[in-house]
Structures are given as C-alpha cells and as structure tokens.
C-alpha cells in the first residue's frame, strides 16, 4: 500500500509514477533539492514536481536516508536525517556503478571502475574491446571522458565494437548525453549540460 522510492533520477521518477498509477501511496525521496536535478534545469523539474504533487505523490527532497526500520524481516519505515516515512515496500534507485571487478588490475579504468576506451572501443589491452554501461564515453559538451550509462550510448558502442573488432575504421563520435522522459502528460527531453553545470564549467 505504501511505497517508498529512494532516488529521484529517471528510473526513480518513472517507478514513482508507475506505482501511483497502480493506486499505491507513493513517497519519493532524494538527497538533492529537486527531482532529476542532474539532468534538467529547475524550470523543467518544477513542472514535473507539480505533476507529482497533483497526483498525491509525496516528494521528500533534500533528505538523506539513514536507515530502514521494521519487524520480522519486513520493512515498515524509512528514516532520513530529517524525518521518517511509512513504507511496506522500498525501492532503491540510487544510480549505476560499472560492474567491472573482473577486469580490475587488467584494464585501465576510472576510479569508479568504468573502463577507459579509445575512439574505436579498444581498451588498454590489445585485442580487448568494451562497450556499454561498463565504459566511459566521450562527453562532447565538456570535451572529456565521463561515465554516462544510457541505453542509447550502449547501443551505439556495441555496434561500433562489431564494426571495428576485425579492422578498426569507424570512430565513436561521442555523446551529448541526450535523454528524455514522459511523466504523466508531460514529455521532457534534454541534451548537453544543464544551465547550472554549464555556468560552473565555464567559470
């Protein structure tokens, strides 16, 4: 009856909507002050937040989860640094991390474990290619390597591995981090940096 979704990125937001449409009482918690703060500017997250509020979804923003409480192996409450919220189901949507332990010490990676590749999808080891959410991507707006796990990136990279594995000729052009989401009747898309990030980057 009471569902708590922790993490208000794309997946958390989509799950919150899905549970609400199924008639559940939904609480959406995030440490950021806005939902989807890493992807969208405030003028757009305000629209999305108002949609949720109009549907009765409780938004708990700017709070960090401290612990879960319950009895007999069943969760009953989520406790944050500022309050507590009832929930008989808790879903964690707190981001991705590359599952690359198998290549630790064998391939060059970022600190988070994302495999570093060149423009042909080649790793630091000869004849070893990599693609998808385990890898870094060239982020064109900042002209740097970043970890951006998106299905669109993964599909392109997989195609490039297939094309280049015998004879590397087709270069990866990089990504703008383009993504989109539909929240109830609102369709929102973004590409490149948010205004906030762009200002911080140029300063």
Language-model-detected regions and their locations in the chain:
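Short, conserved glycine- and acidic-residue-centered signature motifs
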Residues: 12, 41, 150-154
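A Rossmann-like FAD-binding core segment of flavoenzymes
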Residues: 22-117, 169
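Mid-to-C-terminal Rossmann-like scaffold of FAD/NAD(P)H-dependent oxidoreductases
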Residues: 134-203
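A structural signal for isolated positions on well-ordered beta-strands in alpha/beta enzyme cores
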Residues: 4, 27-28, 129
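Aromatic pocket-lining residues of Rossmann-like dinucleotide-binding sites
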Residues: 19
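Glycine-rich Rossmann-fold phosphate-binding loop(s) that bind the pyrophosphate
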Residues: 6-11
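FAD-site-proximal beta/loop scaffold in flavoenzymes
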Residues: 1, 72-77, 84-164
